[in-house]
Amino acid sequence: DALGRAKSVRIANSHSSTADGTAFEYGARILLGLARLEAQRLETELRALVLWDGRAGDGVGGTAWVIGQLLALGATVENVYPGREGFIAAAPPTHDDLEDDDRPIRTLLFSDCMGYSKLREEQIAEYTRAFLTGVARLIELAEKEGRAPLAANTWGDGLFFVFADPAAAAAFALSLRDAVRHRALELAMPPEVRLRIALHAGPVTPFQDPITGRPNFAGMNVAFAARIEPIVPENQVCVSEAFAALAAEAGLTEFRFDYLGVTHLHKEFGRHPVYQLRRRGE
């Protein structure tokens, strides 16, 4: 029993039992990213042991696709497939057997202003005008770079953004962090107010919000991202292991991820690995 003998087990998405193409892709990308992060941590090359019959497979997330990604990452791949009939397992589900794939992988940003509840009424009015206007300017800059959020929402001291990929989300999160740290004029905030920013990535359900009329996203991965934010240190950006893995798999070398350990998340969401996001060189 390989699973029973494993030293550790990662569950990429414990919130859903849906078997679709996105689930296979998500798990495969996290596998690749975690392998790359571990190789970087150990300052060694990435070597992969694979069991593959040499067949093309059925697309993204399959064995052939994973091997192609490993080779693209510069990994050494050793195939230990014995080629004997007794070692061939039952055929896995094909994409034709899977449920419809309507949950794209998206990156989720939650941010909260610490100290907001202690502001006076006139300070809240200034915060709403200056701070949120400044955030809107950051969104405009992201749009010019082709990295604008797919959805955005705010409620007083909270921000929620959804991005297409980890690169766009990481760049925006660090720009927001820097603007608050440096007390940029357009992001004027009282000194007692600090920002916490959290990032996570996973399959989500897109929908058109019938109340606002704008695109939005829902699902347990959205809730998971929200539970990271309360444990983030002030004026820092923290990310889930899934986000760090997907960023590593995508080859985002301009960022670094400092492992903070396994942390209890807010509202009894369990213990999960958390990383601090920084620019490389910080």
Q: Language-model segments: which ranges?
A:
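Defense-system signaling and execution modules centered on TIR/cGAS-STING-like, death/scaffold domains
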Residues: 42, 72-109, 114-116, 129, ...
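A generic structural signal for short hydrophobic patches within well-formed alpha-helices
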Residues: 116, 169, 204, 243-244
